[in-house]
Amino acid sequence: MLGSKKYISDIIKDEYKEWKNTKVIVSSGTGTGKTQFMLKILLPYYLQAGKRVLYLCNRKALYDQIRKEMLSLIGVTLMTYQSLQKELRKGSTNTYDLVIADECHYFYLDAKFNGYTDLAYEYVMGQQANVVVFVSATADSFFEDLVKDGVVKKDYIYSIPKSYDYVEKVYTYHKSRLTDIIDEILADTDFEKILVFVNSMERLIEMHNYYGDSAYYMCSQSQACSFATRDCIENKKFLNKRMLFTTKVMDNGVDLIDDDLRHIITELFDIDSILQSIGRKRPIDYLDTCSFYFKVYDGRAVNNFYVSNQKQLELVERYMANKDKFLQNLDVQNLDARQIARKNKIFYTDFRTGILKVNQCTLKKYQMDRNTIEDMKQNGYETVLFRRLGTELLNKKSELRIETESKDIFLSILKELERKKLFKEEQKELKEKFRDILGLHDRTMGINTLNGKLQDRQYPYKIVSCKDRLRQSETYNKRYWMIQKI
């Protein structure tokens, strides 16, 4: 159990003193002392020898956590990968004796939404005459590539298999059952807390529309979200409220040490992100247990992810097959490199020359995702998911029994608005409900589009357009919508 588990310092022992001009992998699950080894053993050893140290983090939350823990360490340069990329774009080329690449899955995992991961990647990979330590609990694919490409030798791999001995049960569910699951938990107990990872801002908004102020909500600071509370975690607990909904912004750097946190639900699609999300809880003792809930995507949803992934890859593969022909076609279409880079996440433009370039980290991530999604298309999402999660969690899988049926938010809205006259302002509000709750993002949201969505969702309602014929009315001769029962 928890009291007898190994820590990474037990595996490395004093071997770190023999690391010379090499690259090292430290791979182990959360709670195995990776960070403590770096801060309490490795960094002091280098600092006492007068060496220069760079510590890289992938999230601001992790940066803040590390900064608090290394207050007594003078001489360490602490940066996020994103800050390093900004410095490199300015031409900065500082050198260090030791580089800690913490949460190094960043190079692949963030590559889909950060166009400059290549800069940090090339900088770290290009380090010479020093030691680079790659640290992560979930960078399996990245570590495999490091070994396959000869970057890291097998003698410099230190790992501890991930343990989920604190997990009591594992469940799977489909999207429509999320609120049912949560409502069932809330009804069964009056203290157990729930952490939910949603896959989009639209889903976060939908949950806020349903649960309102009874829950906390977290998202990236770059998102304009009036109801998000980014300081809702105090002393590694979320206080006062029993629910926290978050996007993948909380995938690491935030540890939750709270024996009331008994349920972690994830709707994320990317399995590497899922592994990060379920690692947020740090059990206190063997009595501190938790259940996991994984959303299962059907074949149609998996195919949608595949189409989206392929759309990005195909353009880049045409470019790589014949660069000259590709660039000539750009000229013919009167397009420049920056326009292409804005449309395609794998391309970026060199900040000095403006030349079109391929982000190799992003390309690798898209290629890996293609292989994974093709596997899902053939064998099913759930099969591939549990293959990655491992047999320990698979063996804890149980059937989900739900007695509480949650209300349908949108159906309640339709019932409330039934037979009411909806003029221009009310129509605008209704369209916002279609967007926020049903995820409708068509450019033109006319009455036919809205009725099509109602039909797709099998709601027994339709919207009709009418004209006010009451001469005494202030809205005489104006058109309005009305929601009618079919």
What are these regions (language model features)?
Residues S27-T32, H105-Y106, A120-V147:
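Conserved helicase ATPase motor motifs in RecA-like P-loop NTPase domains
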Residues T30, T35, V53-Y63, E184-Y211:
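Conserved strand-helix element at the start of the C-terminal RecA-like helicase core
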Residues I41-L42, N309-I486:
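The feature captures the C-terminal accessory region of ATP-dependent helicases
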Residues Y55-D97, F227-E234:
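Inter-Walker segment of RecA-like/P-loop motor cores
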Residues S92-Q127:
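SF2 helicase catalytic motif II
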Residues A139-I185:
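Interdomain hinge/linker at the junction between the two RecA-like core domains of SF2 helicases
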Residues Y216-T247:
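Conserved helicase ATPase core of P-loop NTP-dependent helicases/translocases
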Residues E267-F292:
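Conserved SF2 helicase motif VI
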